[in-house]
Amino acid sequence: MSRFAIKQDRVIQGIKDLYEHKRAEICSRLDEFKEMWQAGTEEQIFCELVFCILTPMARGAMCSKAVENMTRSGILFKGNCAEIAKELTGARFINKKAAYIVEARDKILHGNPVSLRSILGKINDGYQAREWLVRHVKGIGYKEAGHFLRNIGFNQDLAILDRHILKNLKKLAVIDSFPDSLSRRQYLTIEVKMQEFSEAVHIPMSHLDFVLWYKETGEILK
């Protein structure tokens, strides 16, 4: 019997009810992500990587707007660090994030004869792809790498452990405490616990992420 079997209280039932209410919308959003992997351009995939580089300590809507503005103006693909930083008003660590974007662009988009899609396609495993991104792209940690791989439709089984998700995992007794920071070992340990909970309540990992995010924010964003 699952260790979550006796935890069928109002909180868990509320998660299940919310999932049934939002399931169709969640599936639609995930289908959009799959379309990105199947038909998106290399530039569109890079834009998703930039979005995920921007997300730490920043609102998703602001990150999306910044990427849209920089794409429209061409700064994202041609601008220097200072020009990109000017577009990140409202975010934290704008100079550092701008530098990460330029380095990723020069390494992945401009300086690599093999596309990011080809690299990930050869890896063909979500966990290994995440490790590759963490090792090779500055500004990308385990959360951001999982977020990126989900958003481009490459993998839907990785945990995206931001503060909203961690807060709810504690409420659901999946974890005992809210960690101030996460080492690689801690991240992977919590991911396994979230996967166990996902199986116990019969909500796929990628769907569960959206449900817990919606519970906190009232939105289903990317």
Predicted regions and their residues:
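Amphipathic alpha-helical interaction segments
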Residues: 48-49, 83, 99-103, 147, ...
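C-terminal accessory module of base-excision DNA glycosylases/AP lyases that mediates lesion recognition
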Residues: 1-36, 98, 113-222
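Short, hydrophobic/amphipathic alpha-helical patches that form generic packing surfaces
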Residues: 48-57, 103-106, 150, 209-217
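Hydrophobic (often cysteine-bearing) scaffold residues that line and stabilize catalytic clefts
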Residues: 42, 46, 59, 97, ...
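Alpha-helix N-cap and coil->helix boundary residues
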Residues: 61-65, 79, 96, 143, ...
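Alpha-helical ds-nucleic-acid-binding substructure associated with the helix-hairpin-helix region
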Residues: 67-138
